[in-house]
């Protein structure tokens, strides 16, 4: 089954908690704190794989979760880092993260970080100072990043075969490559793109057979529209035309239909290198139709083939190689720039709003501090309050009208405001 669009949820691993421990050994007085740090949570990456041609395996997984980091331990031992999760996806996959275009994997083995694992919490050995020699403080591991991810596959093929239904595209692909697409004598036999690798005179290239396009495809009519995006990146287009016509129209009328659909869908597609192939020449019912087609077409080269018998295939392959050797200027039409370059934008340490009588403080710094603080440890709680005070949260709450006894919320933690 060919799947070219998938939505999934990614959750990086949480960091391991830091440890509170003190060195206790005979003959070692004042051993001091030796609680180790927690390990970082695992990251999640996408990596392009040339052997994958569909997103089918991802469609069965609505959620991916990386491994959490392990807790720190005594002896100043850090916890093990969570294992990174690497998800293989086909070449040419567009990645949309939280509704915005994030990356486009165009090269084999390209790997990109999507969500980062949480930082491991610090153990009490990390809080030792000259003045504070016996800290009873440790942090919880920070949660990993999460993201809603949409994947959209755009096949990367050197040659794209297109045309009206039943023009013989699948048969032609099976002649020039080892691909074995479904072939039958009725329209819309091909319901999804087929990829094949062509090996001709020591040269290799890929070819894709696109499902039949019908009139009005640019408006979303028929099957072909769903797959037109797959030929945006092809270097050469092979326009396959049934010599006997289709749907009661002669070959030239059918040729014009496909050309018009390409122009309406994308001006860039209409400007690509195109090889015109008049197929099923062995079953031509009228030589007059062939002459009429050539008369109206007015192109320097027209290839007459029979994909069923192999007639004209060798000449067509030579032309494909010749066209592929020409330089191609790829258009950026329909493409957008990735957003995975991090932008640094100044944000205040916190903002305060009032919701249903509760003072709500938001901001990356105060929320992260809240997430990693162990509130069941008295010393950790005192440290938490001192940091918030130094940040100016208490003064700002008073300015907003907070009084003793009012509720303050930061993240999932609520506490009572005191003077």
Curated annotation (Swiss-Prot):
Residues 342-419 form the OCT domain. Residues 1-156 form the Obg domain. It comes from Endomicrobium trichonymphae. Belongs to the TRAFAC class OBG-HflX-like GTPase superfamily. OBG GTPase family. GO terms for biological process: ribosome biogenesis. The lineage of its organism: Bacteria, Pseudomonadati, Elusimicrobiota, Endomicrobiia, Endomicrobiales. An essential GTPase which binds GTP, GDP and possibly (p)ppGpp with moderate affinity, with high nucleotide exchange rates and a fairly low GTP hydrolysis rate. Plays a role in control of the cell cycle, stress response, ribosome biogenesis and in those bacteria that undergo differentiation, in morphogenesis control. InterPro entries: G_OBG, GTP-bd, GTP-bd_Obg/CgtA, GTP-bd_prot_GTP1/OBG_C_sf, GTP1-OBG_CS, GTP1_OBG_dom, GTP1_OBG_dom_sf, OBG_GTPase. Monomer. This is GTPase Obg. One of its GO terms (cellular component) is cytoplasm. NCBIfam families: Obg_CgtA, Obg_CgtA_exten, PRK12296.1, PRK12297.1, PRK12299.1, small_GTP. Keywords: Cytoplasm, GTP-binding, Hydrolase, Magnesium, Metal-binding, Nucleotide-binding. Its EC number is 3.6.5.-. The keyword Metal-binding applies. It holds the Pfam family MMR_HSR1. Residues 157-325 form the OBG-type G domain.
């Amino acid at each position: 089954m060919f799947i070219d669009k998938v939505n999934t949820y990614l959750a990086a691993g949480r960091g391991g908690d830091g440890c509170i421990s003190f060195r206790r050994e005979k003959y070692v007085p004042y051993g001091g704190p030796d609680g180790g740090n927690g390990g970082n949570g695992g990251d999640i990456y996408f990596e392009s794989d040339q052997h994958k041609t569909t997103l089918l395996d991802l469609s069965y997984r609505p959620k991916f979760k990386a491994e959490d980091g392990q807790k720190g331990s005594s002896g100043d031992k850090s916890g093990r880092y969570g294992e990174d999760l690497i998800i293989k996806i086909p070449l040419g996959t567009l990645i949309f993260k939280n509704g915005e275009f994030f990356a486009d994997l165009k090269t084999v083995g390209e790997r990109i970080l999507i969500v980062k694992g949480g930082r491991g919490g610090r153990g009490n050995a990390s809080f030792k100072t000259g003045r504070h020699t016996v800290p009873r403080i440790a942090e919880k591991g920070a949660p990993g990043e999460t993201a809603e991810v949409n994947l959209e596959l755009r096949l990367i093929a050197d040659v794209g075969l297109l045309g009206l239904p039943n023009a013989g595209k699948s048969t032609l692909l099976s002649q020039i490559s080892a691909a074995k697409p479904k072939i039958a004598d009725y329209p819309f036999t091909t319901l999804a793109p087929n990829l094949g690798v062509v090996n001709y005179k020591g040269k290799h290239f890929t070819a894709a057979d696109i499902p039949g396009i019908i009139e009005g495809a640019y408006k979303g009519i028929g099957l072909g529209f769903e797959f037109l995006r797959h030929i945006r990146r092809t270097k050469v287009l092979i326009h396959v035309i049934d010599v006997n016509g289709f749907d009661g129209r002669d070959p030239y009328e059918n040729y014009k239909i496909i050309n018009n659909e390409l122009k309406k869908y994308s001006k860039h597609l209409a400007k690509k290198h195109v090889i015109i192939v008049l197929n099923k020449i062995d079953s031509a019912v009228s030589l007059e139709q062939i002459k009429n087609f050539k008369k109206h077409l007015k192109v320097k080269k027209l290839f007459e083939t029979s994909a069923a018998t192999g007639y004209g295939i060798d000449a067509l392959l030579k032309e494909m190689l010749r066209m592929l050797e020409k330089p191609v200027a790829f258009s950026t039409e329909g493409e957008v720039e990735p957003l995975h370059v991090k932008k640094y934008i100044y944000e205040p340490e916190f903002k305060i709003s009032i919701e249903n009588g509760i003072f709500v403080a938001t901001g990356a710094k105060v929320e992260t501090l809240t997430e990693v603080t162990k509130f069941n440890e008295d010393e950790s709680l005192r440290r938490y309050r001192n940091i918030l005070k130094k940040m100016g949260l208490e003064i700002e709450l008073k300015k907003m009208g907070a009084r003793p006894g009012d509720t303050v919320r930061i993240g999932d933690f609520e506490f009572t405001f005191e003077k």
